């Protein structure tokens, strides 16, 4: 029994336990194609390749103030009005501010669930108590934090860790996830 050569990865990680088998599917075999979910905004759907895919994660980046939050609130309202549950979490604005924007856009009657928090643990704990939504918007990923990760909100480790936890939830539960990211001079 010949031992596999040690690699940088295997030297850093104990590969002898804790993993689980991953199911591979063949690219050339027909499979179930997920149904894309329209955002109700034709150009946004076109940019997404036809709409949102359940279990996918989208990073919407751009300069502050260009309309990312407004666009996503409009998409969430359209999806919610079509009968899919939508959750919009703002780490930057109070729910009252989001409601005021919705009223200005004529979306005040849309059944979108709003929350104003920055704790990924609290978000995931709450989502774990209910049926997964069709759409989860996190506005913005730079404001989120996880108490299991070192560093302040907005640091590379926090952004990566929080995004990882949210993406894992989305994939495991078939939730379309949109993370808002603000582009800054620092990148």
Pin down the residues of each PLM region.
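Residue-level signal for well-ordered alpha-helical segments
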Residues: 21-25, 29, 35-37, 143, ...
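Cys/His-rich Zn2+-binding cysteine-cluster or related metal-binding knuckle/ribbon modules and their
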Residues: 1-7, 141, 180-187
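P-loop/Walker A NTP-binding module and the surrounding RecA-like catalytic core of P-loop NTPases
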Residues: 159, 167, 173-187
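Conserved inter-motif catalytic segment of the P-loop NTP-binding fold
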Residues: 42, 53-55, 62-66, 70-75, ...
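Detector for small/aliphatic-rich hydrophobic stretches
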Residues: 1-58, 80-85
